[in-house]
Amino acid sequence: MLPNTGKLAGCTLFITGASRGIGKAIALKAARDGANVVIAAKTAEAHPKLPGTIYTAASEIEAAGGKALPCIVDVRDENQISAAVEKAVDTFGGIDILVNNASAISLTNTLETPMKKVDLMMGINTRGTYLTSKICIPYLKKSKVAHILNLSPPLNLNPIWFKNHCAYTIAKYGMSMCALGMSEEYKGEIAVNALWPKTAIHTAAMDMLGGSGVDKQCRTPDIMADAAYAILSKPKDFTGNFVIDEELLKHEGIKDLDVYAVSPGHPLLPDFFLDESPEALASAMEEHGATAAFKAGKAQAKSQDSSPLQETFKAIESLVNEEAVKTTQGIYQFVLSGEESGNWFLDLKNGKGGVGSGEPSTKADVVMSMDSGDFIKMFTGKMKPTMAFMSGKLKIKGDMGLALKLEKILGQMNAKL
C-alpha cells in the first residue's frame, strides 16, 4: 500500500459522505498524517442496515492521529453546508481540501426511475457537488495546497453507459463536469481533479447492488484512499485530470495491487463508465473464471421431449422449498425472448413456492426480461445477474430489493444443480 509521507499534516479536509465507505477511508488515510477532517454527512444516528455514523467515524479518525469535526450535512441543503463550512473555519482556521464523495445511485431505466429518485441523484451528485464546491471555494483560494477532488468517472460518452441507467449517468457525469469546468476556472489557484476506481469497491452500496458474494470480486476502499492521498499530495498544477485509481498507483510505484483485494487472487468486477463495453467486460470475466463464485451446474439428464429451458425450470423446481419462500417473499416473472420465448414464473412468496410457465396467479413483484439462452446461462451459474444487468442483457421492472436477492438465490441453487 502507499505509505504516508506527512504531506497532509495540519491540512483541513472537508469530506462529504465520510461516515462510511470510501469517504471514511480517505479521511483515515489523511488522519494518519495528522490532518484535520470535517465529516460532512447525514448519518448522526446508527442506521439499521448501514454501518457507521459521523460520530463513530470521528472516533476512528482521532484514533488514527487526526482531529475530527463531525457535522450533520445533507449536501442538498445550502444552509447545512454553509454552517458546516463556517464551523470548520472557526475550528481549524480554514479549509485546504474538499472531497466531494457523497453520491446517490439507482440503476434503473427511464420509465422505471421515479422523479423522486431522479431529483435525489441530481440533488446529491450534481447539485450537491456544485454547491459544496461553491461554498468552499472562497476559503480554498486562501490555501497554499488547495484541492477539490470529485469521486466521479471520466466523461465517456459511449451510449452503452446511458441506455440502462440514464438518470444516474447524467447525475454522475454532472460531478465530472464540475471537475472539468472548475479546473479551468480556478487554474493556478485550486487543483480540481476527479478520481474513479478501475474495479468495484466493496462498500455497503455495492453489497446492495451486487448481492451476496459480490465482495469477493471487489477491492477495499483503501485503494481509493491511497489514490486520493497521492492526488492530494501533488502541487496545484496537477489539475483537470480524470484519474483511475489503479493507473495512478502503478505510476506511484505500487506493484502488488492484490493487497487491495477483498479476496486476493479472485477475478475482479470492473466498474462502470470505463472504455471497455459491458459486453466485453462480461466476456473477459468469464474467460478468467469470474463466475467461479458460483459453482457451474452439473449436467442434468435430459429427456428427448424436454428443451434446455424446460430442464432448467425442472431443476429450479426441485430446489424450491418453504425455507426459500420464508427468506425471499417475492414472485418473479421471466419474460423470455429468443429461441425459447415465453413467460415463466418463480413463486417464492406463497405456500411451499412454485415454478411454472405463463404468468403467476398473483401479480409478480419483479419482472425480468432477457433472452432465453442468457436465462439458462444465468440459472446454471455461467452468467451472473450483476453482469447480465450491467451489459443490458437483463431488464428489470419492479422491486429492485427483491431483484437483488436473486443472486443469492442463484448461488444457493447453483451449488446444488
UniProtKB/Swiss-Prot annotation:
GO terms for molecular function: oxidoreductase activity. NADP(+) binds at residues 17-23, 42, 74, 172. The keyword NADP applies. The active site is at 168 (proton acceptor). Its EC number is 1.-.-.-. SUPFAM superfamilies: NAD(P)-binding Rossmann-fold domains (SSF51735), SCP-like (SSF55718). Residues 306-414 form the SCP2 domain. It holds the Pfam family SCP2. It is found in: Peroxisome; Mitochondrion. GO terms for cellular component: mitochondrion; peroxisome. Keywords: Mitochondrion, NADP, Oxidoreductase, Peroxisome. The keyword Mitochondrion applies. InterPro entries: HSDL2 (IPR051935), NAD(P)-bd_dom_sf (IPR036291), SCP2_sterol-bd_dom (IPR003033), SCP2_sterol-bd_dom_sf (IPR036527), SDR_fam (IPR002347). PANTHER family: HYDROXYSTEROID DEHYDROGENASE-LIKE PROTEIN 2. Has apparently no steroid dehydrogenase activity. Might act as a metabolic regulator that affects systemic adaptation to nutritional cues. Belongs to the short-chain dehydrogenases/reductases (SDR) family. This is Hydroxysteroid dehydrogenase-like protein 2. The lineage of its organism: Eukaryota, Metazoa, Chordata, Craniata, Vertebrata.
